[in-house]
């Protein structure tokens, strides 16, 4: 038997990721140097830690039920143990001794009961015996109710979804091919190509165009690193991806510290390597000439998309950078676990603005479509709205009861293709709710409450009339943004990490923890 600390750490790290503890997984991964291990994550199946724990538990259960000579205890059911009980010292000996004593008592009691029954039966008539032993079927209790009619249900009640809103199976396409959890997915902005990124160290481009011969085809983008003068497969997670505005190039960030740019046909165009650790976020600017990345090395980098050259590295955060977003083609904002938000501009050697006010890690930031307001969300359970015109936040929105994981602006209002509709902001939280906000008034207009687990992703339809949400409860919900009502619902086969709409607004893509990618035809 061989067990190394690297192997144990990797299984714990994967368990934290699969269970939705993204920040804990990140911290643990850094402290245990997961990125420096030689473990090939593509060979490790989902739920590996749980599986090996279950096997160990079954071994202890079987051990309790076996005599020292190897024979099984007579009339002994296999013990059902909890994990904590199983690790108690001497639990095997304690349970075996307790069962032996219980068995002796049961045998003595059975002998006494049998003797008493025989003596009693000798003095009873056949009719009396019949009354003493009524038929077993549908036994009646003293109040006339049937036994079992009101059994106690110790399981949580499953969520009930109205059948009218359930998306039928023929409207859902499940795409399989990834060998590990799929963290991210994104539609090409001009065609029905869906990109997905996974813990199996690959990204895939799925062709769902109507003319793709009736089925979906996939391109597998395998990440390689240079070792000893040769390209060898990387075994690190794909953490982020983003299409450029004309849909010709796909940029991806990885846990191996490299960003890569691929063509829509699956050809590697360039590899961007200057980060000293995993990349957590990356975005194209609108013009399509620069790619922006954020990493665990506390820096953000602007890359020339055509040459692959790092134009400028911004070392202003004091802890890992978690998210970035462009304000315009030259200026961007970044957030970090250091609780700060920096606004930086290409060519400037210091932040042009720094926003402080959050009291915990800042998970996500998003500029509104006009570039005037910046929204941020944090583990401090608040959502804040900032303006370049002032240092203090414009709104400090407090309603969620747990960490807020992500936020999205609606594609409505000024500077959008829907200028006559008012702008909204959506927030998704670990408290299992999604909230819609009127940013001008600073109030919550709707609280969407059908999910039962943390909500990891929200996305507005292109017209802003609908909002998709994805949760670790395996459900994708589609909501009406004006009424807050649930209009469509789909239960997948794994926890949902990401949801996204195609450009026409008639399909929703979702990526899941079991390695599946589903496409909902609305």
Curated annotation (Swiss-Prot):
InterPro entries cross-referenced by the UniProt entry: Ebi-like (IPR045183), G-protein_beta_WD-40_rep (IPR020472), LisH (IPR006594), WD40/YVTN_repeat-like_dom_sf (IPR015943), WD40_repeat_CS (IPR019775), WD40_repeat_dom_sf (IPR036322), WD40_rpt (IPR001680)
Phosphoserine: residues bearing it: 130
GO BP terms: regulation of transcription by RNA polymerase II
UniProt keyword list: Acetylation, Activator, Deafness, Disease variant, Isopeptide bond, Non-syndromic deafness, Nucleus, Phosphoprotein, Repeat, Transcription, Transcription regulation, Ubl conjugation, Ubl conjugation pathway, WD repeat
Domain LisH: 4-36
Transmembrane segment boundaries: none
WD repeats: 177-216, 233-272, 274-313, 316-354, 357-396, 399-447, 450-489, 491-521
Family: Belongs to the WD repeat EBI family.
Subunit architecture: Probable component of the N-Cor repressor complex and some E3 ubiquitin ligase complex. Interacts with NCOR2.
Protein name: F-box-like/WD repeat-containing protein TBL1Y
Gene name, Swiss-Prot/TrEMBL: TBL1Y
